[in-house]
């Protein structure tokens, strides 16, 4: 029982001893959780040639994690960790579970903005350098570090870059560990170098400059006494009272020296371990393969060494400290010339024994580890040299304290070691959101922007969309400062256009009560004890803007002052309008301002500081030669404008509006007066619809217009204002139309005016005003063409008269404009007798607007010239006094002249009073012998001679005129009362046209064009050998057979002409235009002017396509069906008058059989074969309409003409059932 207790007590004491050792050796441990990467695997048979260390070959490697003959774990060479990657530490069981954490290193953050000092930043004087600073305090436990640096000969010569990098990296490490030099708290550094012997360069110190000086003095010397360097470091560390003790060993190859082993025996050596990665196995295999490169002799004997076999043994790495002879710290078992990886010991026979300096260094490191020192090793520029790398890995405290490095990244290795020793912050991330209204200099894209900022350590990314800076700080050492500095500018336009709040509680400035430079800046970090997600908020600096700008914008507006784009599209604001000239800046006089644009602001007040700002020029000439004039429009800045700015509203904007100086100039070769030619306009563009038209003058453009401006005939124009102070005219050409929406400005009325053109064959130009009230005094010249003359071959009544009205308010008649002698008469309704009295008729002294006149000329050829009426244009509604004088002839017949420069709309433009028939009577210019067919042919279109009645409601239908052109006259009839007022509406005026079928052409032979017919209608033409007439009949159930005002037009009879008219069922009314409820029983009257044959031609609307319309000849007692385009011929004698025909309509009538009348020729005769059940009549005409023969053909019979001369003939067939009645026949 006692024995059992003794055993338990022994185990307990052993546990306590181990526990106590762990506490003493490593009282505190601080670790960073960082990913452990592995380097790329290398080829197993690659040849390794480290400089000055001999040619070593990596043998076949067999991976084995634990040596069978060693107590140390060996990792394969392909798991060597690069210097720039920092792995996780793994705490021991006791440190993990039983040790208390040390006090956390304190961390503080700060943020401040410093105005950019003079000279001012040229981009923007509202600039600040913003700095975020993270400050770590001193470590909370003392730390001592001994740096052991290899200065062997392999660091020099062709490898001098190694030494240079080591010197630079060593100094960097010193400065990182001692950032405040002598003032650094808690950290000291000692310095040892080694070659064939160790050198104590410095004991523990904080003197950064002294340590750097010693490092810079390193010089390559032969030999590599790694054990000596570690022993020297142990000796220095023995004086340390720090809690954390660290040795940093840097070597570029194999150890070649070691201390002598006292009382050496074969037990002090060890054979192969069976782990191909173990340095023991690697060195034996290398010596077997290349013995002369690996083996040197012991200096105590000159014997030539024997070379190893697989049974050979090398010096152990776990000898007790007492076995080494430290009596002379510079002592060694090798000497120059025979140093090597293995040193032959001749005192022991086969299997041969060798000292192994790398194992001696590992052994020496273990003594330091046993004392609680942490050893960091750096394999410097070793590449894949497995023997050297694995030796240094075993020298380190563990594999996580071993680093590989090259001259290029040696500094990173030292940095990683510094971070394990002297952590203030393990990992940190700062997010900083730049405030609205501020822009970071140079940051225009998202991504890594570290190179664009001033960053002490770590990396910075920027997100353009959120204006977020993310600063990944990495590890920050204790007693250090990490900073990032970036420059911000005030975004003046954003601040101007957005209500950015000010920070009234900030106490750090630089301008208290100003704008925040950021919305939030926060540090999230892992502290020195590994506690993550720690957070600190940075303060928010506030600034005020010291400088503002006033921008002057020069933008385009249209004629209405609306902002527009270059193509004329209207936009919603001046800021969207087309820019005529690049913006510039207003700079007031006085001190403190910065050329060329920065205005010094008063930071003591938020009130606006106002400046009187003019445009640079009132006329702008662009690169294409166009000129623009300054104008003031709603919303634009006047000249000058008062613009205010302040530190809160720093960007003033003046928007100066300009209109294109697009004057009419003219003069383009062969197109000098054409409106739509761009080169005729100074702005090289044709004015858009509704824009002003202004003529160039010396005053407004520097040179005047050189040609008249003609309104194009095929492109009606609408303009705004017409401004003409030149000596050129705006010409409204024949058949053209100009509408003026604005006003006419003419400060030079004697020259340069409006001219409205007329001619014989084209309608007078049309000039209309959209705002009549603003254009009551517009002057102009209107041309008038007279067709009246002395016609020598026109029959008994030779003199041709034209009825007209003057086109201005009043005027004398311009008798000198056309040759010959004019006779001008005025229609006087109250006069009893010949109502045509010489004009002007008293009390008038001049011709007056809207009065009716007639004119003829004694010349005996049709006139070609025009008269020019000059005066004030009539631009208003007309209120005309009509009279109906009792006891006179033609009582109530009032003749009115159209004095407008547009056509009067018969249906919409005349307000008929109740006393007046709603019918206008148009007189077609000509003699009393005109409007007839002479010898079967149609006379010229200008010959006319009788009135045409046009009821208001049927105007425009079936070739009835719909308008009364300018300067034409018309007659209206009062039915009752003594006087009344008739109104003509100006805003209903239409475009002038030729008289719509009112010049004689409506009485055309066999008319096939019935015009538009919105109502059921029948148009009948009567054609005689010497005269013709036309009758219009419209049906509507609401009308009567009597007079319907506005629907019926009475016939004004003329002697000596054939007359066709509808007869009223009561009274003696005769209608040229008849509106009736239906066609049934409507009587048609006919007055014959001569004995002879007459033909009726019919134009029937589609409304009567169903059923049948019939014409009964009351004189002959025959009935014929009327079809569209059909005809009926009859005989009449001079003096015949009254009812001749009766119409009827049977809606249910259906044609009983197909019409079958054949027309052919036999020799020179025309043969008619009637195969239908009705008799038919055949009329044979020449092609120019002259009736030759009339044949009656009975049912089932034939009839033939007399022989005819060769040529073409037209045969018109008439029967009650005929639907297709016109045939063309050629006799040959």
Curated annotation (Swiss-Prot):
PROSITE patterns: VWFA (PS50234). Residues 144-267 form the VWFA domain. It is found in: Fimbrium. Pfam families: VWA_2. Gene3D superfamilies: von Willebrand factor, type A domain (3.40.50.410). The keyword Cytoplasm does not apply. Residues 1-25 form the signal peptide. Keywords: Fimbrium, Signal, Virulence. GO terms for cellular component: pilus. It comes from the Bacteria. The keyword Signal applies. Accessory subunit of the minor fimbriae. These filamentous pili are attached to the cell surface; they mediate biofilm formation, adhesion onto host cells and onto other bacteria that are part of the oral microbiome. They play an important role in invasion of periodontal tissues and are recognized as major virulence factors. Fimbrium subunits from different strains have highly divergent sequences, and this correlates with pathogenicity. The name (minor fimbrium subunit) does not indicate the abundance of the protein, but is derived from the greater length of the major fimbriae. In strain ATCC 33277 and strain ATCC BAA-1703 / FDC 381, major fimbriae are 300 - 1600 nM in length and about 5 nm in diameter. In contrast, minor fimbriae are only about 80 - 120 nm long. This length difference is observed only in a small number of strains, including strain ATCC 33277 and strain ATCC BAA-1703 / FDC 381, and is due to a loss of function mutation in FimB, a protein that restricts fimbrial length in other strains. Minor fimbriae are composed of a structural subunit, most often Mfa1, and the accessory subunits Mfa3, Mfa4 and Mfa5. Fimbrium assembly occurs by linear, head-to-tail oligomerization of fimbrial subunits. This is mediated via insertion of a C-terminal beta-strand from one subunit into a groove in the N-terminal domain of the following subunit. This is Minor fimbrium subunit Mfa5. It comes from Porphyromonas gingivalis (strain ATCC 33277 / DSM 20709 / CIP 103683 / JCM 12257 / NCTC 11834 / 2561). The lineage of its organism: Bacteria, Pseudomonadati, Bacteroidota, Bacteroidia, Bacteroidales.
């Amino acid at each position: 029982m006692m024995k059992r207790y003794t055993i338990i007590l022994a185990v307990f004491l052993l546990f306590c001893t181990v526990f106590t050792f762990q506490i003493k050796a490593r009282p505190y441990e601080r670790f960073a959780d960082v990913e452990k990467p592995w380097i790329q695997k290398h080829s197993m048979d690659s040849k390794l040639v480290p400089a000055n260390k001999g040619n070593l070959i990596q043998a076949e490697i067999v991976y084995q994690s634990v040596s069978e003959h060693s107590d140390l774990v060996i990792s394969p060479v392909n798991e060597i960790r690069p210097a720039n990657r920092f792995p996780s530490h793994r705490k021991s069981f006791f440190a993990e579970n039983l040790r208390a954490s040390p006090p956390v290193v304190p961390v503080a953050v700060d943020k401040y903005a410093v105005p950019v000092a003079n000279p001012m930043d040229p981009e923007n004087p509202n600039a600040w350098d913003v700095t975020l600073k993270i400050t770590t305090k001193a470590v909370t436990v003392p730390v001592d570090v001994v740096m052991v640096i290899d200065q062997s000969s392999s660091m020099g010569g062709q490898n001098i870059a190694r030494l240079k990098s080591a010197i630079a990296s060593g100094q960097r490490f010193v400065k990182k560990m001692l950032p405040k030099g002598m003032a650094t708290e808690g950290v000291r550094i000692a310095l040892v170098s080694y070659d064939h012997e160790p050198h104590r360069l410095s004991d523990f110190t904080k003197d950064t400059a002294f340590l750097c000086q010693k490092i810079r003095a390193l010089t390559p010397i032969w030999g590599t006494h790694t054990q000596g360097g570690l022993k020297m470091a142990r000796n220095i560390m023995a004086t340390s009272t720090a809690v954390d003790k660290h040795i940093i060993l840097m070597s570029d190859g194999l150890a070649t020296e070691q201390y002598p082993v006292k009382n050496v025996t074969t037990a002090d050596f060890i054979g192969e371990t069976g782990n191909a990665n173990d340095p023991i196995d690697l060195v034996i295999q290398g010596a077997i393969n290349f013995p002369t490169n690996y083996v040197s002799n012991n200096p105590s004997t000159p014997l030539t060494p024997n070379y190893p076999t697989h049974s050979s043994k090398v010096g152990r790495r776990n000898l007790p400290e007492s076995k080494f002879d430290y009596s002379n710290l510079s002592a060694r078992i090798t000497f120059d010339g025979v140093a090597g990886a293995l040193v032959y010991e001749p005192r022991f026979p086969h299997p041969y024994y060798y000292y192994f300096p790398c194992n001696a260094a590992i052994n020496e490191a273990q003594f330091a580890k046993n004392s609680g020192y942490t050893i960091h090793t750096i394999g410097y520029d070793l590449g894949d040299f497995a023997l050297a790398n694995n030796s240094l890995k075993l020298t380190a405290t563990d594999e996580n304290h071993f680093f590989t490095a090259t001259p290029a990244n040696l500094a990173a290795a030292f940095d990683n070691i510094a971070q394990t020793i002297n952590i203030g912050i393990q990992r940190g991330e700062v997010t900083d959101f730049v405030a609205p209204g501020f822009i970071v200099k140079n940051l225009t894209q998202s991504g890594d922007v570290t190179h664009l900022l001033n960053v002490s350590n770590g990396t910075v990314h920027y997100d353009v969309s959120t204006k977020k800076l993310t600063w990944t700080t990495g590890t920050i050492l204790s007693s250090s400062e990490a900073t990032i500095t970036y420059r911000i500018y005030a975004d003046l336009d954003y601040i101007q256009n957005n209500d950015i709040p000010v920070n009234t509680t900030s106490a750090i400035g630089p301008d208290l009560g100003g704008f925040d430079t950021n919305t939030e800046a926060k540090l999230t970090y892992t502290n020195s004890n590994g506690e993550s997600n720690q957070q600190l908020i940075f303060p928010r600096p506030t600034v005020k803007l010291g400088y503002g700008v006033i921008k002057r914008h020069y933008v385009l507006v249209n004629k209405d002052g609306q902002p527009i784009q270059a193509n004329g599209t209207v936009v919603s604001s001046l800021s969207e309008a087309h820019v005529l000239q690049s913006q510039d800046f207003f700079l007031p006089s006085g001190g403190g301002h910065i050329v060329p644009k920065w205005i010094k602001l008063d930071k003591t007040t938020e009130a606006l500081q106002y400046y009187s700002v003019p445009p640079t020029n009132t006329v702008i000439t662009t690169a294409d030669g166009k000129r623009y004039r300054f104008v003031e429009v709603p919303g634009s800045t006047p000249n000058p404008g008062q613009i205010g700015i302040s530190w809160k509203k720093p960007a003033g904007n003046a928007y100066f509006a300009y209109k294109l100086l697009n004057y009419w100039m003219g003069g383009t070769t062969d197109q000098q007066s054409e409106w739509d030619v761009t080169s005729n306009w100074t702005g090289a563009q044709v004015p858009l619809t509704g824009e002003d038209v202004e003529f160039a003058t010396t005053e407004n453009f520097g040179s005047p217009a050189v040609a008249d401006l003609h309104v194009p005939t095929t492109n009606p124009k609408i303009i705004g204002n017409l401004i003409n102070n030149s000596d050129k005219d705006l010409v409204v050409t024949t058949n053209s139309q100009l509408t003026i929406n604005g006003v006419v400005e003419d400060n030079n009325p004697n020259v340069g005016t409006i001219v409205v053109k007329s001619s014989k064959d084209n309608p007078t130009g049309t000039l209309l005003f959209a705002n009549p009230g603003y254009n009551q005094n517009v002057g102009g010249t209107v041309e008038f063409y007279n067709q009246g003359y002395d016609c020598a071959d026109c029959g008994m009544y030779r003199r041709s008269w034209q009825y007209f009205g003057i086109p201005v308010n009043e005027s004398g008649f311009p008798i000198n404009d056309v040759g010959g002698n004019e006779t001008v008469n005025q229609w006087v309704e109250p006069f009893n007798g010949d109502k045509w009295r010489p004009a002007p008729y008293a009390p008038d002294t001049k011709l007056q607007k809207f009065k009716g006149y007639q004119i003829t000329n004694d010349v005996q050829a049709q006139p070609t010239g025009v008269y020019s009426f000059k005066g004030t244009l009539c631009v208003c509604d007309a209120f005309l006094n009509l009279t109906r004088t009792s006891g006179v002839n033609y009582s109530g017949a009032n003749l009115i002249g159209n004095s407008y420069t547009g056509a009067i709309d018969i249906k919409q433009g005349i307000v008929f009073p109740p006393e007046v028939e709603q019918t206008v009577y148009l007189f077609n210019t000509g003699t009393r012998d005109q409007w007839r067919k002479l010898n079967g042919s149609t006379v010229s279109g200008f010959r006319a001679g009788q009135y045409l009645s046009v009821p208001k409601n049927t105007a425009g239908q079936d070739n009835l005129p719909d308008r009364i052109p300018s300067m034409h006259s018309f007659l209206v009839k009062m039915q009752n009362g003594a006087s009344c007022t008739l109104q003509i509406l100006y805003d209903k005026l239409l475009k002038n046209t030729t008289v719509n079928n009112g010049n004689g052409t409506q009485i055309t032979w066999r008319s096939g064009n019935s015009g538009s017919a919105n109502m059921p209608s029948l148009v009948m033409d009567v054609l005689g050998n010497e005269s013709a007439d036309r009758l219009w009949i419209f049906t509507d159930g609401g009308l009567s057979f009597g007079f319907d005002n506005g629907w019926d037009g009475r016939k004004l009879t003329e002697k000596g002409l054939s007359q066709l008219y509808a007869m009223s069922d009561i009274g003696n009314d005769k209608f040229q235009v008849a509106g009736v409820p239906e066609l049934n029983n409507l009587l048609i009257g006919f007055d014959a002017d001569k004995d002879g044959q007459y033909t009726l031609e019919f134009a029937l609307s589609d409304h009567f396509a169903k059923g049948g319309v019939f014409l009964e000849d009351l004189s002959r007692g025959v009935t014929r069906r009327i079809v569209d385009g059909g005809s009926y011929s009859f005989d009449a004698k001079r003096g015949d008058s009254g009812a001749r025909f009766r119409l009827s309509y049977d809606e249910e009538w259906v044609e009983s059989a197909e019409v079958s009348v054949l027309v052919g020729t036999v020799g020179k005769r025309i043969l008619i074969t009637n195969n239908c059940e009705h008799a038919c009549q055949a009329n044979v005409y020449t092609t120019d309409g002259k009736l030759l023969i009339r044949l009656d053909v009975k049912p089932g019979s034939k009839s033939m003409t007399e022989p005819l001369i060769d040529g073409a003939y037209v045969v018109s067939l008439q029967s009650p059932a005929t639907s297709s009645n016109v045939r063309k026949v050629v006799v040959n």
